[in-house]
Regions:
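N-terminal pro-sequences and low-complexity stem/linker regions of secreted or lumenal proteins
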Residues: 438, 452-898
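Predominantly soluble domains enriched in secretory-pathway, periplasmic, or organellar proteins
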Residues: 16-473, 481
Length: 898
């Protein structure tokens, strides 16, 4: 076979990138994420290979026609879901087909020119798509395409509902609802059968295409979460990977009977994509939670070997998709966590002796690759390699995306009992939201030779390392056994930098975008004046589900990353994130690592990985015991912790389980209880103070203290609740009281307090919509410094890990940029910190006359992130600046909702 020389078509100038990487200057590295240059929030500088084609919102599916002419991609994000067909010769999208909802499953039968796409329920945010075929969800959408043009037309819908007797989906709170959720797909070589894993129904569907789409169900293990599918060359046997049970089920397609389960990894190892070689001798399975590829011997139905495709720095390359080269000599592995393709030697006459099963090298891609395909050379065209990356190069500027201010705009229908009549996030809505503007990309290239892959490997390795890395300065307190013995990690909700600190008058700030400035947040302003002002810290998240994984685990598992967007989009995905084992990261959470290393800790309010009282089909006795140990060192408040007094992060402004007839019963304050508060009220800080003083008396203050403080999320202008500025001011007072309490204690000299936001989805920012206000408070924190270096949430986590001597949980925190620049080697900032009293009345309540009070009263503002952020942005702006004021534009790099 002739392989042409690889065409290098990166979308960024590699020379400039290498110059930045090799420069010794601390200022050579950029400090602002910029899609125009491929510089990401986490500090990675993308240098992707291949001609790049812009795709839709978060594409996770890809399949190519047998002739290699047309690449089908499936957009499966929070925004508009669609099919985009790429002409791989002209390297452009030739057709976009709107669909109600997608999970990313797509399979092509090139013999009959039929395409099959997994369909899920239409989003209520997109009412114009409710009339599209398959709007009820749980179906397969069938299309035909023309050989010459590649253009497709819709043919029919194949329903695949959950089979009778299916168990309810696992959700928090619990539900009786069932769902199927067709996931990846496989079509038999002759096109007669389709194999459909049903991710939420513990089963697979076998569709007999030639028998009027007759559907038979194959029952799999309870709590299996079936995901990937493959069919052997003879067309009689299918394989289904099961994410939670760590197995591959072997299915007889003629009878619809499961023959056996092959264990390919431990429970919760998340087997995902499966591919079978042309001879039907071996199958390959990607284990996304373990950074491994498993080889199955299909003659003996057993695991032949397991191959690591991870990085030595830590877990988290996340292999999610596979493709075998046309000649069968190599396996291409899409690694969504490392933005690369790993390439492995397979047994083949073309493979040199001794190289079988070894790593050839790695190919850098754009961000978050979720699909990879290969095509044989034909018609004078070289063999091809193609990939689909869900996040592309990040999100670009949005200078014309102001927050909608018209109360009669369709956005205001979003949480009305009457469904919206126009698309909330559609063209012309004027609404922007983080995640809905994420755009994927396809990378197209000639199939590289081994030598070319090896030459690309150094670029892939450079790409995963953040720019501007620093060596630990001499005497830094960010070290195990150093002077800092107690870490306090405060996680707040959703504010961006300019919304709070735009009026600080220092650093890179814009007062025109400020809502909760000096008068509302005097404590934070004072803290970032005395301690470092960090004006380039970015949230890695778009919303709270991701945000609390980043803060508590330094990573977001692929299961969470691909599913939270559809839960937020109201397409029927249950909320199981962080509370059911199937959603947990491979190495667990910070609390789990503290347990493993015997590092003392206490958790105030974080529910991620801390719900042992819930029934869970996938929780082993060992995992249950681990959760119980964490729960014993946690306070999640009434209803979740026996005798608990510190409310969990799940609700805003109310105690879980308060009296529905009295919406103010059990109202929660972040700060000390204000005088005149309603009966039964209490505060997070009062709860913390009682436990902290007890720990001090016993000389038992933990090394790691994690505190959720959520009152700054606000309740909008809902009648009877504190006005937004009062809730944010109360949260600010809580922060001031926390620092005051710690700084006047006997452990202050050995303490550090890190304050972050879980995400940045609220407000406008002139630098980047992901920028957040962060405070670092310690006797060792630099006095009055202004620090422009780029950091992210994982930088904060890594800094805390270094202090505690905690091992990194993932590739993300292992490679993150520690906040060395924020600290000094000596305690030069050791004076106690006094809390500044609130400058506004914390008991001021919204009245029916408040701006858009009627609208706020219809919204579920007591639930985290249950309201489109653009909507809440406008409410908050008008609550401060008046009903006739106009909120500012979203600013550069905003995503939908900002």
């Amino acid at each position: 076979m002739t392989i042409r020389r690889l065409s290098f078509i990166p979308i960024f100038a590699l020379v400039a990138v290498l110059a930045a990487l090799t420069s010794g200057s601390a200022h050579a590295a950029p400090n602002t994420p910029d899609p125009a240059t491929g510089f990401l929030l986490n500090g990675r500088q993308l240098t992707p290979q291949g001609a790049q084609v812009r795709l839709g919102n978060f594409p996770t599916g890809g399949a190519v026609t047998a002739d290699g002419r047309f690449l089908w991609t499936v957009s499966a994000g929070l925004g508009a879901n669609d099919i985009r067909i790429v002409d791989t010769v002209r390297r452009r999208v030739i057709q976009t087909i709107p669909i109600p909802g997608a999970s990313g499953g797509v399979a092509l039968d090139s013999r009959h020119r039929l395409a099959y796409v997994s369909g899920i329920t239409v989003s209520r945010w997109w009412p114009t798509q409710a009339t599209l075929p398959g709007a009820a969800g749980n179906c397969i959408l069938v299309y035909g395409w023309k050989a010459a043009s590649g253009k497709a037309r819709f043919l029919r819908v194949i329903p695949v509902p959950p089979q009778p007797g299916s168990l309810p989906v696992q959700a928090f709170p619990a539900t009786t609802a069932t769902n199927a959720w067709p996931q990846k797909l496989a079509v038999s070589p002759d096109g007669s059968r389709l194999l459909v894993p049903l991710n939420l129904a513990d089963s697979a569907a076998v569709v007999d295409i030639n028998e009027h789409d007759r559907v038979r169900y194959v029952r799999l293990a309870s709590g299996a979460y079936p995901f990937g599918a493959a069919i052997l060359p003879g067309g009689r046997t299918g394989l289904v990977s099961n994410e939670a049970t760590g197995t591959v089920s072997v299915v007889a397609l003629r009878t619809g009977v499961k023959r056996r389960d092959i264990t390919v990894g431990p429970p919760l190892s998340h087997p995902q994509d499966i591919v079978v070689d042309r001879a039907g001798r071996r199958a390959y399975v990607a284990l996304s939670a373990l950074d491994e590829v498993v080889v199955i011997d299909l003659h003996h139905w057993r695991v032949e070997r397991t191959i690591s495709v991870g990085r030595s720095a830590g877990l988290g390359t996340m292999p999610v998709a596979l493709a075998i080269s046309p000649e069968g000599a190599r396996l291409f592995v899409a690694e969504s966590g490392a933005d690369e393709l790993a390439v492995l030697h397979l047994p083949s006459p073309m493979t040199r002796a001794g190289l079988t099963w070894t790593l050839v090298g790695r190919i850098p891609t754009t961000e978050d690759p979720h699909a990879v395909v290969t095509v044989a050379a034909q018609g004078g065209r070289a063999a091809q390699l193609m990939y689909v990356a869900a996040r592309g190069v990040g999100v670009g500027p949005n200078p014309t995306g102001p927050v909608t201010t018209d109360p009669f705009d369709p956005i205001w229908w979003a949480f009305n009992p009457i469904a919206p009549t126009t698309d909330v996030f559609g063209p012309g809505s004027g609404v922007t939201y983080l995640a809905a503007m994420v755009r994927g990309q396809a990378g197209l290239m000639a199939l590289p030779s081994d030598a070319q892959v090896k030459r690309l490997s150094p670029a892939a390795t450079r790409q995963i390392h953040p720019l501007g890395a620093q060596k630990a300065p001499a005497g830094t307190p960010l070290r195990a056994g150093g002077p800092i013995k107690h870490v306090f990690f405060v996680v707040r909700e959703n504010r961006d930098y300019d919304q709070v600190l735009g009026d600080i008058g220092r650093g890179n700030s814009d007062p025109h975008l400020t809502i909760f400035g000096q008068d509302v947040t005097p404590n934070l302003h004072a803290l970032v004046t005395r301690f470092p002002l960090l004006d380039h810290v970015f949230a890695n998240s778009e919303a709270s589900i991701q945000g609390h994984f980043w803060t508590s685990a330094a990573s977001v598992p692929d299961y969470v990353d691909r599913n939270w967007v559809q839960e937020y989009a109201a397409r029927g995905r249950p909320n199981d994130f962080g509370v059911y084992a199937v959603t947990f990261p491979g190495n667990g959470f910070l609390f789990d690592q503290a347990e493993r290393q015997h590092i003392s800790y206490f958790n105030y309010g974080e529910i991620a990985g801390d719900q042992p009282t819930l029934g869970d089909r996938d929780r082993s006795p060992a995992l249950l015991a681990e959760e119980q140990r964490v729960a014993a060192n946690s306070d999640l408040g009434p209803g979740l912790t026996p005798g608990g007094t510190y409310p969990a992060v799940g609700g805003i402004g109310q105690v879980t389980g308060s009296d529905p007839a009295n919406p103010l019963d059990g109202e929660i304050f972040d700060s000390s209880l204000p005088a005149g508060a309603p009966p039964g009220s209490y505060s997070r800080i009062d709860s913390f103070r009682a436990r902290f003083e007890s720990q001090l008396a016993a000389n038992a203050v933990p090394a790691f203290n994690y505190l959720c403080m959520t009152g700054d999320h606000t309740r909008g202008t809902q009648t009877g609740f504190p006005i937004p500025t009062a809730m944010v001011a109360d949260n600010d007072l809580a922060l001031g009281q926390l620092v005051d309490l710690i700084s006047r204690s006997k452990i202050w000299s050995s303490s550090a307090i890190f304050v972050v936001e879980d995400d940045s989805q609220d407000g406008a920012d002139h630098v980047n919509a992901h920028r957040i206000p962060v405070a670092v408070i310690s006797p060792y924190a630099r006095k009055g410094a202004i620090i422009h270096r780029r950091y992210d949430l994982v930088s904060v986590v890594r800094s805390m890990e270094l202090i505690m001597g905690m091992k990194a949980l993932s590739l993300n925190d292992a490679l993150a940029t520690p906040m060395y620049e924020a600290f000094t080697s000596r305690p030069l900032n050791a004076a106690p910190v006094g809390a500044i009293p609130a400058k506004i009345d914390l008991l001021t309540r919204n009245t029916a006359a408040a701006p858009w009070a009627a609208l706020s009263n219809r919204l579920p503002l007591g639930e985290v992130d249950a309201v489109p952020q653009g909507q809440l942005d406008a409410i908050l702006w008008k609550s401060v600046h008046g009903a006739n004021s106009t909120p500012p534009p979203a600013g550069p790099n905003a995503e939908k909702g900002q």
